[in-house]
């Protein structure tokens, strides 16, 4: 029996590539066995030497992505709906929250491509589907990182300069436009193959930029995009939130020292003792989301560096699918972090969806909060 016949008997469908040799035990093919010959050129050679995973792994990931798609679509859809239609939430600062939700929503739009490929066990939608998948992922991933940095910048101004907030709608819109423009080159360059290209990875069901081709241009692209899309936003996030934490600690220390001089237990009201201020709660939500961004994208960044500069044998199809899934998971979790931590969003959600049984107390009036803040600052200054 010839090789093609052996492969047909070992697979559940027709083998389009006879050169996808049968493995030693005779019951598994190499990846790409069901890819048309005219599509093979788009797949890095590294993956064509890896064994095809069991069909159950494809189906399990497909079901997992169905869950991610539903949760992300509903969660981010609600954030976009409420933040864009509620007057109470229509503030310059929340323009960044809305922008992040848009990026996360876009991220989930590529899930149907992955799901279709998974249930067809490979590169079913071909190079066209791959380019769409990777372009969406690049825009949404890089955009989410830079938006998280912008949120950190805004939170720093709100908390350290509460009486001199200089964020306006115009400035917020300009910053969001800059973020979108910042993402564009990292999508257009590989999409047009001017610099690098988008290729399938892992089980050939997802796509990203090429980090496996062994040449200088690929290594330069990987190093450049790693710096500008991951290192830069991460450093900005760390700086902004370290400044916020430092300011909060120094402010609390000053209040305690002043209270001690005045022989009182605390300068804060009973309301402030029982709960954090709205600004701090929002900052906590932002810190959580930035932490999720770092945790979810770090494995992917490390994987791409290994592919470009390290030992490629470490990159098995199964190992590369783990970071590919974790970086999608954050887009699903983000909206629920805000649902838990953002007080005004919770109030609006409670009003529009009472069946969710959210119990969020109305915050103090802005005037009262402003008066309290002013008194604290005056007392601290007097010290």
UniProtKB/Swiss-Prot annotation:
Gene3D superfamilies: Rhodopsin 7-helix transmembrane proteins (1.20.1070.10)
Bias (Low complexity): 364-383
Protein name: Opsin Rh4
Extracellular side: 1-57, 118-133, 197-220, 309-316
Gene Ontology, cellular component aspect: membrane
Transmembrane intervals: 58-82, 95-117, 134-153, 172-196, 221-248, 285-308, 317-341
Protein keywords: Chromophore, Disulfide bond, G-protein coupled receptor, Glycoprotein, Membrane, Phosphoprotein, Photoreceptor protein, Receptor, Retinal protein, Sensory transduction, Transducer, Transmembrane, Transmembrane helix, Vision
Post-translational modification: Phosphorylated on some or all of the serine and threonine residues present in the C-terminal region.
Function, in words: Visual pigments are the light-absorbing molecules that mediate vision. They consist of an apoprotein, opsin, covalently linked to cis-retinal.
Membrane topology: Multi-pass membrane protein
Listed SUPFAM superfamilies: Family A G protein-coupled receptor-like (SSF81321)
Sequence positions bearing N6-(retinylidene)lysine: 328
GO biological process entries: phototransduction; visual perception
Intracellular or extracellular location(s): Membrane
Organism listed in the record: Drosophila virilis (Fruit fly)
Major location category of this protein: membrane
Disulfide bonds: 130-207
InterPro entries: GPCR_opsins, GPCR_Rhodpsn, GPCR_Rhodpsn_7TM, Opsin, Retinal_BS
Note: Each Drosophila eye is composed of 800 facets or ommatidia. Each ommatidium contains 8 photoreceptor cells (R1-R8), the R1 to R6 cells are outer cells, while R7 and R8 are inner cells.
Pfam families in the cross-refs: 7tm_1
Entry-listed glycosylation sites: 9
Gene: Rh4
PANTHER family: OPSIN
Molecular functions per Gene Ontology: G protein-coupled photoreceptor activity
Protein family membership: Belongs to the G-protein coupled receptor 1 family. Opsin subfamily.
Segments of this protein annotated with the region Disordered: 361-383
Membrane topology (Cytoplasmic): 83-94, 154-171, 249-284, 342-383
């Amino acid at each position: 029996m010839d090789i093609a016949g052996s492969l047909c008997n070992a697979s559940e469908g027709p083998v389009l590539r006879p050169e996808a040799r049968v493995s030693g035990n005779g019951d598994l093919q190499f990846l790409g066995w069901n890819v048309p010959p005219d599509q093979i050129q788009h797949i890095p050679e590294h993956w064509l030497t890896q064994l095809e995973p069991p069909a159950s792994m494809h189906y399990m990931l497909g079901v997992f992505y169905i869950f991610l798609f539903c949760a992300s679509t509903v969660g981010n859809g609600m954030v976009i709906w409420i933040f864009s239609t509620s007057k109470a939430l229509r503030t310059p600062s929340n323009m960044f929250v809305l922008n992040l939700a848009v990026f996360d929503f876009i991220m989930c739009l590529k899930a149907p491509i992955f799901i279709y490929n998974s249930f067809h066990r490979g590169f079913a939608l071909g190079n066209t589907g791959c380019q769409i998948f990777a372009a969406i992922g690049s825009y949404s991933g890089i955009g989410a990182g830079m938006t998280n940095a912008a949120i950190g910048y805004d939170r720093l101004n709100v908390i350290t300069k509460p009486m001199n907030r200089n964020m306006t709608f115009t400035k917020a819109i300009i910053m969001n436009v800059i973020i979108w423009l910042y993402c564009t080159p990292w999508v257009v360059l590989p999409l047009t193959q001017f610099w690098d290209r988008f290729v399938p990875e892992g089980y050939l069901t997802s796509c990203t930029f090429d980090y496996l081709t062994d040449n200088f241009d690929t290594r330069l692209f990987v190093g450049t995009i790693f710096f500008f899309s991951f290192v830069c936003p991460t450093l900005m996030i760390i700086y902004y939130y370290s400044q916020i934490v430092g300011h909060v600690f120094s402010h609390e220390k000053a209040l305690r020292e002043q209270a001690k001089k005045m022989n009182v237990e605390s300068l804060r009201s009973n309301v402030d003792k029982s709960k954090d201020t709205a600004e701090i709660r929002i900052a906590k939500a932002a810190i959580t989301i930035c932490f999720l961004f770092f945790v979810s994208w770090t494995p992917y960044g490390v994987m791409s560096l290994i592919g470009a500069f390290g030992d490629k044998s470490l990159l098995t199809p199964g190992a590369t699918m783990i970071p590919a899934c974790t970086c999608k998971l954050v887009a699903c979790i983000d909206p629920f972090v805000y649902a838990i931590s953002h007080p005004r969003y919770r109030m609006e959600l409670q009003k529009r969806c009472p069946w969710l049984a959210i119990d969020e107390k109305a915050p103090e009036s802005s005037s009262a909060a402003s008066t309290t803040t002013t008194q604290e600052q005056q007392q601290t200054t007097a010290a």
